Amino acid sequence: MRYAIMVTGPAYGTQQASSALQFAHALLNEGHELASVFFYREGVYNANLLTSPASDEYDLVRAWQKLNTQHGVALNICVAAALRRGIIDETEAGRLALPSANLQPGFTLSGLGALAEASLTCDRVVQF
C-alpha cells in the first residue's frame, strides 16, 4: 500500500512526531511505500535546523532527515505554518531580508497542495 503521513506535533514535548517516525519505519520495514510526510501546524518544528537536543537525547530532527536520505521520502512542511513559527529556507530568508535560514536539509517548504496531492495519490493518509 502507498501511505502518506501528516505530523502536527513538534519534535519535542509530545509523542506525535516520534510516533509518526516509528510508524514510518514500520511501514517501510513491512514493504509498504511511504510517499511523503507533511508537517503542519506545530509539526513544522521538526524541520528546525537549530534544534539541539542534549547528547543523551534522541535527535528527532536528524532522524527525519535520515529517513529522507536513506529512503527518499519527501519531507514537506507547510510554508504558511513554517513562516509563522520562524522556520525559513534560503529563498524566504532573502525575500524577507532575514539574516539566515534555518530549514533542515531534506525538508521542503510546500503548500497545502502537497497534502492534497498525497491524499489523492495514496491509499492511506495517517495523521499524528
Swiss-Prot record:
Function noted in UniProt: Part of a sulfur-relay system required for 2-thiolation of 5-methylaminomethyl-2-thiouridine (mnm(5)s(2)U) at tRNA wobble positions. Accepts sulfur from TusA and transfers it in turn to TusE.
Superkingdom of origin organism: Bacteria
Family listed: Belongs to the DsrE/TusD family.
The protein's enzyme class: transferase
One GO cellular component term noted in the UniProt record for this chain: sulfurtransferase complex
Keyword check for Transferase: yes
Descriptive protein name: Sulfurtransferase TusD
Its EC number(s): 2.8.1.-
Gene Ontology biological-process annotations: tRNA wobble position uridine thiolation
Signal peptide: none
Record-linked HAMAP family: Thiourid_synth_D (MF_00390)
SUPFAM superfamilies per UniProt: DsrEFH-like
Active site: C78 (cysteine persulfide intermediate)
Gene behind the chain: tusD
Assembly: Heterohexamer, formed by a dimer of trimers. The hexameric TusBCD complex contains 2 copies each of TusB, TusC and TusD. The TusBCD complex interacts with TusE.
The keyword Hydrolase appears for this protein: no
Organism name: Salmonella typhimurium (strain LT2 / SGSC1412 / ATCC 700720)
Key words, A-Z: Cytoplasm, Transferase, tRNA processing
Coiled-coil stretches: none
A GO molecular function held by the record: sulfur carrier activity
InterPro entries, per database record: DsrEFH-like, Sulphur_relay_DsrE/F-like, Sulphur_relay_TusD/DsrE
Localization annotation: Cytoplasm
